[in-house]
A protein has these predicted regions:
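Tryptophan-centric aromatic hotspots in well-structured domains and transmembrane helices
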Residues: 1-5, 99, 129, 172
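Extracytoplasmic ligand-binding site segments that recognize negatively charged/polar headgroups
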Residues: 1-83, 87-89
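Sec/Tat-exported extracytoplasmic proteins
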Residues: 8, 17, 30-34, 72-76, ...
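An acidic- and aromatic-residue-enriched active-site/binding cleft used to recognize and process polar
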Residues: 18, 122-124, 169
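Extracytoplasmic/secreted proteins, especially bacterial periplasmic and envelope-associated proteins
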Residues: 21-24, 60, 64-67, 71, ...
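Charged, glycine/proline-rich intrinsically disordered loops and linkers
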Residues: 33-63, 186-217
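Extracytoplasmic/periplasmic substrate-binding proteins
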Residues: 74-142
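Mature extracytoplasmic/periplasmic domains
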Residues: 135-213
Length: 218
């Protein structure tokens, strides 16, 4: 996270014009030394403490974050929401605080020119995020037709063929698995499967489904 303040990259790095993303980056800077200590990691309530630290929105934390963000503002090329990936591809900047889909886009764009970009996650912490569709209670109310239309739309974009089209266009992996239909898995394997014969498959199913009494899953 300290990269955003590194003078070596003065005006050669961009940050997100987003309260959530930039505030978290600052919290990451402020807490990374403590989080990486064995004493912190070996606590019985590690997850609760981690969440408490990174999601701290006390007046003092916000005030401290504001001062750090002012320094970041002086060091970065810009705060952006969409132009950062183009600036990275063109070489205008050398690093960009990106969402994963923008990272995929940037890497694919320069790959054809023989240039390799890397996507990295800070060792101490990062934020977990997702985009989703919501049916607003205030918007639908008791209108059955509106509810049916909203549900039909969600069903439509959740079809495996449309999920693949969306993933191809936006560069993000969907949470939709497709059930018995393997279209989505086949696409992911085709696009992102390892080409290294020495690679090892690692089963992450435990992270996405309940295992007995273990509730530590998404």
């Amino acid at each position: 996270w300290g990269l955003l303040l590194n003078q070596k990259y003065y005006k050669k790095i961009t940050a997100k014009d987003s309260v959530r993303d930039c505030y978290f980056a600052v919290r990451g800077m402020q807490t990374q030394k403590e989080i990486l200590t064995k004493k912190f990691q070996n606590q019985s309530n590690y997850k609760e403490r981690l969440s408490s630290l990174l999601n701290d929105t006390s007046d003092q934390s916000i005030q401290n974050a504001g001062m750090i963000l002012s320094k970041i503002k002086d060091n970065v090329y810009s705060f952006e929401t969409d132009s950062g990936k183009a600036d990275l591809v063109s070489g205008k900047v050398v690093a960009n605080l990106q969402w994963s889909g923008d990272g995929v886009y940037s890497m694919q764009q320069v790959e054809e020119e023989g240039i390799k970009l890397r996507y990295a996650v800070p060792k101490a912490s990062t934020n977990l995020w997702f985009d989703g569709w919501c049916m607003l209670k205030a918007g639908i109310g008791k209108d059955k037709e509106k509810q049916q239309a909203a549900q039909a739309f969600v069903n439509y974009i959740s079809r495996p063929d449309n999920v693949v089209r969306n993933m191809y266009y936006v560069g993000y992996t969907s949470v939709i698995s497709g059930g018995e239909d393997k279209t989505i898995y086949d696409y992911i394997k085709y696009m992102y499967g390892s080409e290294d014969k020495k690679s090892v498959d690692y089963d992450l199913n435990y992270f996405f489904q309940q295992n007995g009494d273990n509730y530590n899953y998404v």
